[in-house]
């Protein structure tokens, strides 16, 4: 049974009037992925679904990525094939429109798994990806407002103070996008993010770390969203697939993974989506919101929500 699920990030959507547009965004992404999935390729389905989310400035990935402490965009992305365990990822990349597509090229055109920073940018250019500025006016304005507050308080160098201030913008603090699909033969997972607003320059989250934010094998695939450091410490995406190997379906495994995150790091930290090799989808969160949408065989329209 074929299936696909996408997410647009876990956290709190502060401006609730945005919720209908966010739901429409994940719905559009899953429908795009579903069309590719019906052609037979989970890999294409995941890439195209994530690209739709990267191109939507409502989400913190690709266009609309949040800015670092020094006002730059540094994006992370990863994609993984469950049948072969092939994977590709980029971290701290800038100047490209769709990091998920660069990650796929890393997987298909190199012997490596992860390229970072300037090396990832150079590779993207070699692969024909043109220069692109993903910064939006809204993100720049938010960055300027927060930076002004930091300068006024004299706390610009203190990360704990930054953590307190960015709670004023929870809708971008933990926003990540991802997709997981099963085409009847293979499970593929992909994730993309702009990271944490006002993050330290050079900071890398869970998204491009295989096993932490993104993972797929022959039994299940997972894409995580939330506080990246939590997913890294728990190897959460891989752990979730291990739950499936032990006998849980995708939904039960998703819930078990979030219980684990909550046990060690408390509520309001993580969200996850999954698909297993029986075509079951799963999603869970310990945050107020996590936008999601899914389609599987027998459904005429996607289910979507926050």
Swiss-Prot record:
GO terms for molecular function: asparaginase activity; peptidase activity. GO terms for cellular component: cytoplasm. Keywords: Autocatalytic cleavage, Hydrolase, Protease. Heterotetramer of two alpha and two beta chains arranged as a dimer of alpha/beta heterodimers. Pfam families: Asparaginase_2. Belongs to the Ntn-hydrolase family. This is Plant-type L-asparaginase. The keyword Protease applies. Autocleaved. Generates the alpha and beta subunits. The N-terminal residue of the beta subunit is thought to be responsible for the nucleophile hydrolase activity. The active site is at 176 (nucleophile). It comes from Pyrococcus furiosus (strain ATCC 43587 / DSM 3638 / JCM 8422 / Vc1). The record marks 175-176 as: Cleavage. Its EC number is 3.5.1.1. It catalyses: L-asparagine + H2O = L-aspartate + NH4(+). Catalyzes the hydrolysis of L-asparagine into L-aspartate and ammonia. Substrate binds at residues 203-206, 225-228. GO terms for biological process: proteolysis. The keyword Hydrolase applies. It is an enzyme of class 3 (hydrolase).
């Amino acid at each position: 049974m074929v299936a696909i699920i996408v997410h647009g990030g876990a956290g709190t959507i502060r401006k609730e009037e945005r919720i209908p547009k966010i739901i429409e965004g994940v719905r559009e992404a899953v429908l795009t992925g579903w069309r590719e999935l019906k052609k037979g390729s989970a890999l294409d389905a995941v890439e195209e679904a994530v690209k739709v989310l990267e191109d939507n400035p409502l989400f913190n990935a690709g266009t609309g990525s949040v800015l670092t402490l020094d006002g730059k965009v540094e994006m992370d992305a990863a994609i993984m094939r469950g049948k072969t365990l092939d994977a590709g990822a980029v971290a701290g990349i800038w100047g490209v429109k769709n990091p998920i597509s660069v990650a796929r090229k890393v997987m298909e055109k190199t012997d490596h798994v992860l390229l970072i920073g300037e090396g990832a940018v150079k590779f993207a250019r070699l692969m024909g990806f043109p220069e692109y500025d993903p910064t939006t006016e809204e993100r720049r304005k938010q960055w300027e407002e927060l930076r002004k507050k930091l300068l006024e308080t004299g706390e610009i160098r203190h990360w704990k103070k930054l953590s307190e201030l960015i709670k004023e913008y929870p809708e971008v603090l933990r926003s990540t996008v991802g997709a997981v699909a099963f085409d009847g033969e293979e499970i593929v997972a992909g994730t993309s993010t702009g990271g944490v607003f006002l993050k330290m320059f050079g900071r890398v989250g869970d998204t491009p770390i295989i096993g932490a934010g993104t993972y797929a094998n022959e039994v299940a695939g997972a894409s995580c969203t939330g506080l990246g450091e939590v997913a890294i410490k728990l190897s959460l995406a891989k752990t979730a697939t291990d739950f499936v190997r032990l006998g849980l379906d995708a939904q039960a495994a998703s819930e078990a993974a979030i219980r684990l995150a909550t046990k060690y790091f408390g509520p309001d930290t993580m969200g996850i989506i999954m698909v297993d090799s029986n075509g079951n989808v799963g999603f869970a969160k310990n945050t107020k919101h996590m936008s999601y949408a899914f389609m599987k065989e027998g459904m005429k329209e996607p289910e979507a929500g926050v």
